[in-house]
Regions:
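Hydrophobic positions on the alpha1 helix immediately C-terminal to the Walker A/P-loop
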Residues: 18, 22
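Short, structured coil segments at secondary-structure junctions
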Residues: 26-28, 120-121
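Conserved nucleotide-sensing/catalytic segment adjacent to the nucleotide-binding pocket
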Residues: 31-34, 40-88, 103
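ATP-dependent NMP and nucleoside kinases share a basic, alpha-helical "lid"
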Residues: 92-143
């Protein structure tokens, strides 16, 4: 059974960066899963409606698929992680195969929100950064 670490925090708090740093310490023994890959596919609604979606709400994420993928990895079964296009609000097949590994690092805004996912986590981290710093980071990141 792998060790699963959940990393949460506000947008721009450094979740992804921290997850990648942990992974770099164990490159052959770890897998990173990004919650952002699991945003709901909105291809069934018009683009103007999709643009109004609040992605900073747990309902924007298909957490049942994320939970299923975590369970598969927990059982030693590889999965194909989705990807998400913020241009057309669609989930894409990424070809990104996640292999079972001794360490699974799950990062995202809401990974501590859902009990069924939270109960799979061996370690739960919340990165607390002041809102001004997070906003600066988010603007820098999102306007590249």
């Amino acid at each position: 059974m792998p060790i699963i670490i959940g990393i949460s925090g506000g947008s721009g708090s450094g979740k992804s960066r921290f997850a990648r740093r942990v992974q770099s310490a164990f490159p052959e023994e770890s897998t990173v899963i990004e919650q952002d890959w699991y945003y709901r596919d909105l291809s069934g609604i018009n683009l103007e409606q999709a643009k109004k979606t609040n992605f900073d709400h747990p309902n924007a994420v298909e957490h049942t698929l994320l939970h299923h993928h975590l369970n598969c990895l927990n059982q030693g079964i590889e999965v194909e992680a989705p990807d998400y296009s913020y241009i057309n609000y669609r989930r894409l097949l990424s070809g990104n195969i996640l292999f079972p590994s001794p360490l699974i690092i799950l990062e995202g805004l809401f990974v501590l929100c859902w009990p069924e996912i939270r109960n799979l986590l061996h370690f739960k981290l919340y990165i607390n950064v002041d809102s001004e710093t997070r906003l600066e980071r988010r603007l820098k990141r999102d306007t590249k």
